[in-house]
């Protein structure tokens, strides 16, 4: 890239810092007429940087000066004199920039493609028709979906309860998971539950009334159980909640999502469960609450209030657990049973008994949601939704 600068321009290097333009003119002026002398100086100190450019009117004079003065001493220093060349960076600099630019777009495209991935994952969720499958699949698949899925999901459910879901989701999304475990733990951990209970109780009344308001109920309950955080996801209650519950979430995630078609189902579940069957379950719960007999374990659970907590949590939990049925089985069995065990101190059988209720849950959730539940709960859900 080295190009000769304009003819007659010489580079003089190795100058003494004390040498100035006048000295250069005196030395080189004898070779011919000088058009320009550029002594390069430091911008800050204004001292010579030790090199200069001398331009002769005649290129021949420049050659003579270079031949004679190169290597000669000037002000005590040997100087270098040669034909000046254009800085390589000037010519070279312009070319390279474009490549980076050209590169940019690909990146963008790439990013875009990355973005597109989310929906597919969602599709994955969707494919899981079977809740149980979802869980299994989702559990393996779930975690990833969770990450990718939420965004897509946000598109879907959020609208329903977009407001709650959005904010909540974010908190629940991140916090949710931990909360989930926490939630579950909280399940286990009375402390959280107690606060929830109060809230829940509040919810309960609404629930009882609002109960029907599955949405409010779900969101409410859920929120109560999950501090709204998880439930806030209620919009995505199902999903989110599922999400919220880390395991459930994972399980659910895909399920929730997956079922987003299924999701609808899930939703049916969750909503439904919350709305219809859920409500039923809940009512049963409520009944259990009121009437321990219905769900023996529940009452023993920890008292109706606790039970409520449980139920709400569980319901909220379970509800959102569309998977409720399977997840529930999984989560429930694991989470809830665990919880149940810890909290309830119920014998394993009882815990297991839970699952049956769970089954009933599933049946009620599932049955209701799928059958009348879907229609009815859906309508309920619709109502709830409209509320939001």
Curated annotation (Swiss-Prot):
Biased composition (Low complexity): 320-334, 359-368
Molecular function as annotated in GO: chromatin binding; mRNA binding; RNA binding; RNA polymerase II cis-regulatory region sequence-specific DNA binding
Main function: RNA-binding protein which may be involved in pre-mRNA splicing.
Domain RRM: 8-86
Protein name: RNA binding motif protein, X-linked-like-1
GO biological process, one term: negative regulation of mRNA splicing, via spliceosome
Alphabetical list of SUPFAM superfamilies matching this protein: RNA-binding domain, RBD
Chain ranges passing through the membrane: none
Keyword Phosphoprotein: yes
Superkingdom: Eukaryota
Annotated Gene Ontology cellular component terms: catalytic step 2 spliceosome; euchromatin; extracellular exosome; nucleus; supraspliceosomal complex
Species the sequence originates in: Mus musculus (Mouse)
Positions bearing the Glycyl lysine isopeptide (Lys-Gly) (interchain with G-Cter in SUMO2) cross-link: 80
Keywords noted in UniProt: Isopeptide bond, mRNA processing, mRNA splicing, Nucleus, Phosphoprotein, Ribonucleoprotein, RNA-binding, Ubl conjugation
Ranges annotated as biased composition (Basic and acidic residues): 60-80, 191-212, 238-271, 335-344, 377-388
Positions where Phosphoserine occurs in the chain: 88
Region entry Disordered, spans: 59-388
UniProt key word Membrane: no
Subcellular location(s) per record: Nucleus
Pro residues composition bias: residue spans: 148-161
SMART domains: RRM, RRM_1
């Amino acid at each position: 890239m080295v190009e000769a600068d304009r003819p007659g321009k010489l580079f003089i290097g190795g100058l003494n810092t004390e040498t100035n333009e006048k000295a250069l003119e005196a030395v080189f002026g004898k070779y011919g007429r000088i058009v320009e002398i550029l002594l390069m100086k430091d911008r800050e100190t204004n001292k010579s940087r030790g090199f200069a450019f001398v331009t002769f009117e005649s290129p021949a004079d420049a050659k003579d000066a270079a031949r004679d003065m190169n290597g000669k001493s000037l002000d005590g220093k040997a100087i270098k004199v040669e034909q000046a060349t254009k800085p390589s960076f000037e010519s070279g600099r312009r070319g390279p920039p474009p490549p980076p630019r050209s590169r940019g777009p690909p990146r963008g495209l790439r990013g875009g493609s990355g973005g597109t991935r989310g929906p597919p994952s969602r599709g994955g969720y969707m494919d899981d028709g079977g809740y149980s499958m979802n869980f299994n699949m989702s559990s393996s698949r779930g975690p990833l979906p969770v990450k990718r899925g939420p965004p897509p999901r946000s598109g879907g459910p959020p609208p329903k309860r977009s407001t709650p879901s959005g904010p909540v989701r974010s908190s629940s999304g991140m916090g949710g998971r931990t909360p989930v475990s926490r939630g579950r733990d909280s399940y286990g951990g009375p402390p959280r539950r107690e606060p929830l209970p109060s809230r829940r109780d509040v919810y309960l009344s609404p629930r009882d009334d609002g109960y029907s308001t599955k949405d409010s109920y779900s969101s409410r309950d859920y929120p109560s159980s999950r501090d709204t955080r998880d439930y806030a996801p209620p919009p995505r209650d199902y999903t989110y909640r599922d999400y919220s519950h880390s395991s459930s979430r994972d399980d659910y995630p895909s399920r929730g999502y997956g079922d987003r078609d299924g999701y609808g189902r899930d939703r049916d579940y969750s909503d439904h469960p919350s709305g219809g069957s859920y409500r039923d379950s809940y009512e049963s719960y409520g009944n259990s609450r009121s009437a321990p007999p219905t769900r023996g374990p529940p009452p023993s659970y920890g008292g109706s209030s606790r039970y409520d907590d449980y139920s709400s949590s569980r319901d909220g939990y379970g509800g959102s657990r569309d998977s409720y049925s399977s997840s529930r089985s999984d989560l429930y069995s694991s989470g809830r049973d665990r919880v149940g065990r810890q909290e309830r101190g119920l014998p394993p059988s009882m815990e297991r008994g839970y699952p049956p209720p769970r089954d009933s849950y599933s049946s009620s959730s599932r049955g209701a949601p799928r059958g009348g539940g879907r229609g009815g709960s859906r309508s309920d859900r619709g109502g709830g939704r409209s509320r939001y």
